[in-house]
Amino acid sequence: MKASDTGSAGVLAGKLSALLSYLRSFLPFMWKNFMQDRVLLSAGSLAFQTLLSLIPLMAVVLSVLSVSPVFETFKRYVDDFLFQNFVPASGSMIREYFWEFIGNTATVPTVGGIFLLIIALFLISTIDHTINQIWDVRAPRKILQGFTLYWTVLTLGPIIIGSGLVASSYVWYTVFTEGPFLELRTRILSYLPLVNSFLAFFLLYMLVPNHRVRFLHAVSGAFLATWLFELSKQWFSFYVKTFATFEHIYGALSVIPLLFFWIYLIWVVALSGAEFVYCLGAVRQEVKKERKEFSTLHGLWDVLAVMEQIWKGQQCGQYVRYKKHALSGKGIDAARVRSIVAVLKENRLIHVTEDGEFALHCDIHEVTLFDLYSILPPEILVGSDAAVSGKRFEQLYELEAAVAACLRESLDKPLALYIKQEEGLPE
């Protein structure tokens, strides 16, 4: 084998090993965040509110689009495009009820129209709050900023989306349904819903969080969400056609639970993609493998830093939430903070309030360093000690030196004294 081939194989093996190491860190981190943020419960809440707000929201959107006479011309094409590509099953039944409900909103008086607008705004606000909760953004948007965002979504959003759908539908019915190479062009156009889904998820992850999101992270999350969305469509269609449970139980009313279930799946996909984007930016990017200098109290300082921040927040009435603490906890990475918090909770040194915030569950004037040190598992004591900095911890360094000296004096004895030797063997 050539030296170049050997070198390439070594580089490939190194990259594969680094990838596996990253996945071992990333996947558990994402799963814990997924469970902590109660994504499935949040998706159910959003699905219920979406079901209630869907008709008011679409009524507002269509009223904006109806300002342009062009939309009326292509309304049927847009209708076909939407229900053929984004509603996987029972589309005809849903379409019939959908446009009937939309038509009923035209007779709503002015006060009722304002109420519909408020319901639509509440849905957008809930989506904004849920996505920002994943990033643990607790600072609310400024009133003017929030109003501008929501109003833009309700006005410019429909215009942009509507124009795109009109163009897509026009191309579908005038260019791709006749002429040569029909099969090839139809196959190319079949990817258009994927592009639309990708753009929708990308904008959701890039613009909605009131937090800096890296472009590549948003793109990666959009790819994942689009792929999950397509899988959900296939699975949902298979389920409805194979196991007609809802239709058997509810009959003509089955459209309601079916629509709710489909909206629920969409929100599970969207929030899962948001968790993925968040975790890409929050998880530890690399595992430091270099050998560190021996330290008797290694890892203890990170634990003290976590408890200190919780105690300070408790004193000033600004309780600490996990993710906020994980990202601002003096440089300690999120996975390590999670482990520390779990140990402190298990030993009843801290507890979680009803609002999901942390508070000390012990008297720091009575609990000693030895009490704390004795409960820490090995994985905590081999941490990075990223929190050690500044003059505040000088006394801890002095304590560590004293403990190391005492330990060295006690252990400064040959191994032969403690290794059992058989009789007759030379000592």
UniProtKB/Swiss-Prot annotation:
The chain crosses the membrane at residues 51-71, 107-127, 147-167, 188-208, 218-238, 251-271. It is a multi-pass membrane protein. Keywords: Cell inner membrane, Cell membrane, Membrane, Transmembrane, Transmembrane helix. InterPro entries: UPF0761_bac, Virul_fac_BrkB. GO terms for cellular component: plasma membrane. Pfam families: Virul_fac_BrkB. Belongs to the UPF0761 family. This is UPF0761 membrane protein Cphamn1_1013. It comes from Chlorobium phaeobacteroides (strain BS1).
